[in-house]
């Protein structure tokens, strides 16, 4: 193996162990990396950041975003990530369409120009926290910023997950929003949506389905209800949605996300 190949292998191995992209301040190394990019062996997710093509293709979109964020944090340790970038760190359900540039918090007096890679947002009255080794806006602020910029279905998915993750009450969130940014764009939308939030919802897909029910005027179902098994009443199973009619009969609704078909653990050996 050539010396350059050994150097590249070690560079990528160190980065991958840290779940980051490879970077280098050495111009000679960067030239070698660019040649690998031209040959299709290496990808450049962001300016100055590199990853092996085979490794990168095996990552999910959120994992790719976290790699870029960790790399950016190593270069700019004072950065605080916000909006969808912070949401990914918390594990909030975010549409992949919104995972492009990284979002960084700033102040009015220190605002920078947006670029293809970085979007800057003025964030006031918030204490940053460390999540997955990354400096991010607080959970409440992150939830608020995400909810106010997306449609009702996506906002409800974020709201449901936030209640499940943080264990708080919707009313507390609304009070917090009024204090920190009640006049910001989309604040009223975020507060209205939070009134429908339910921590019992177990996936973003279930939340989006429930949002459609609300928008179309359907009666709201009970969520995650345990019912006895017909052939073994000592055991039970849970349904995603349950409606009870006036005559006492019941209607069951299920939301099947792709994970149920792709995750062997969820299939339990079934095809």
Positions of predicted regions on the chain:
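Short gly/ser-rich loop at a beta-strand->alpha-helix junction or flexible surface loop bordering the NTP-binding
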Residues: 1-186
């Amino acid at each position: 193996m050539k010396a350059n190949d050994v150097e590249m292998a070690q560079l990528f191995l160190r980065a991958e162990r840290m779940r980051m992209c490879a970077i280098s301040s050495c111009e000679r190394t960067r030239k070698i990396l660019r040649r690998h990019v031209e040959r299709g062996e290496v990808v450049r997710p962001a300016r100055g950041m590199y990853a092996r093509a085979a490794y990168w293709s095996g990552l999910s979109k959120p994992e790719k975003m976290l790699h870029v964020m960790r790399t950016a944090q190593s270069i700019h340790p004072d950065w605080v990530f916000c909006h969808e970038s912070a949401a990914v760190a918390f594990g909030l359900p975010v549409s992949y369409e919104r995972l492009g540039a990284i979002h960084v918090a700033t102040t009015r007096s220190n605002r920078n120009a947006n670029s293809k890679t970085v979007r800057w947002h003025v964030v006031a009255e918030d204490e940053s926290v460390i999540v997955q080794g990354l400096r991010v806006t607080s959970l409440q602020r992150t939830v608020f910023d995400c909810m106010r910029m997306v449609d009702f279905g996506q906002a409800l998915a974020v709201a449901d997950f936030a209640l499940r993750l943080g264990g708080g009450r919707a009313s507390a969130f609304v009070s917090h929003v009024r204090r920190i940014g009640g006049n910001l764009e989309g604040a009223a939308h975020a507060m209205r949506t939070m009134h429908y939030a339910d921590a019992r919802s177990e996936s973003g897909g279930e939340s989006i389905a429930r949002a459609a029910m609300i928008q179309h005027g359907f009666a709201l179902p009970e969520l995650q209800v345990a019912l006895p098994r017909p052939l073994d009443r000592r055991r039970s199973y849970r349904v995603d949605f349950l409606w009870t009619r006036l005559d006492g009969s019941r209607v069951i609704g299920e939301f099947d996300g792709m994970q149920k078909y792709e995750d062997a653990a969820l299939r339990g050996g079934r095809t």
